[in-house]
Amino acid sequence: MSIRVIIAGFKGKMGQAACQMVLTDPDLDLVAVLDPFESESEWQGIPVFKDKADLAGFEADVWIDFTTPAVAYENTRFALENGFAPVVGTTGFTSEEIAELKEFSRAQDLGGLIAPNFALGAVLLMQFATQAAKYFPNVEIIELHHDKKKDAPSGTAIKTAELMAEVRESIQQGAADEEELIAGARGADFDGMRIHSVRLPGLVAHQEVIFGNQGEGLTLRHDSYDRISFMTGVNLGIKEVVKRHELVYGLEHLL
């Protein structure tokens, strides 16, 4: 039996890539799409909804969310309330929101996934960086994205920093008497690590994790040149969440 899928934010670039992936997979069935600004009532013969409230009671298994940080939490909560296992690529969740959604998913006996990045290479980068941080506590992150991205730093950069912070010796980097001549020049501070965000047209999603030690350096980098790079992870997420009973944060928990 096919897994019935709803896609929220289907008009965006990630939403469109997800639609094409679902439509070409015989194990998946795209049963509805959601976008508050869509004027048509159908898209490729699939019903279009403008208000998520109209999807209450709809027969579906999985809710894919590529919307905006402003509505992602409400959408994920709505999905769980209505029996849809969420697969969420929208970023901007607080740690408190993620914890609350995990608890609620267990109460609903539903699987779910919030993933800062669906590219398998990016997930591996985070794992490699976590291993390196045990031995190289001096580290900075540079994340680069297209100029339409609404949040900074990226969810991937935050997740990477969180994972490294769990194993890294906590130190304050840079000179003790360091002075920023322009505010923000040293980037955002996360437990002594610095995160730098670049936003330029022509980019998709890229991240470097740069480690330094006496007389040596180590640089890890991942590049997504096309949004198709995320679809393997989205597909995996759809097929895994329907088997599970709680929401997880990070694609690595499903690998």
From Swiss-Prot:
Under which pathway is this protein filed?
Amino-acid biosynthesis; L-lysine biosynthesis via DAP pathway; (S)-tetrahydrodipicolinate from L-aspartate: step 4/4
Q: Which reaction does it catalyse?
A: (S)-2,3,4,5-tetrahydrodipicolinate + NAD(+) + H2O = (2S,4S)-4-hydroxy-2,3,4,5-tetrahydrodipicolinate + NADH + H(+); (S)-2,3,4,5-tetrahydrodipicolinate + NADP(+) + H2O = (2S,4S)-4-hydroxy-2,3,4,5-tetrahydrodipicolinate + NADPH + H(+)
Please give the Pfam families that the UniProt record associates with this protein: DapB_C (PF05173), DapB_N (PF01113)
BP terms from Gene Ontology = diaminopimelate biosynthetic process; lysine biosynthetic process via diaminopimelate
Which top-level group of life is the source organism from? Bacteria
GO terms of molecular function: 4-hydroxy-tetrahydrodipicolinate reductase; NAD binding; NADP binding; oxidoreductase activity, acting on CH or CH2 groups, NAD or NADP as acceptor
Under which EC number(s) is this enzyme classified?
Answer: 1.17.1.8
* Binding, NAD(+): 9-14, 35, 89-91, 115-118
Q: What keywords are annotated for this sequence in UniProt?
A: Amino-acid biosynthesis, Cytoplasm, Diaminopimelate biosynthesis, Lysine biosynthesis, NAD, NADP, Oxidoreductase
Where is this protein localized, as stated in its record?
A: Cytoplasm
One of the record's GO cellular component terms: cytosol
HAMAP family reported for this sequence: DapB
Supply the PANTHER family for this chain.
Answer: 4-HYDROXY-TETRAHYDRODIPICOLINATE REDUCTASE 1, CHLOROPLASTIC-RELATED (PTHR20836:SF0), DIHYDRODIPICOLINATE REDUCTASE (PTHR20836)
* Name of the protein in its database record: 4-hydroxy-tetrahydrodipicolinate reductase
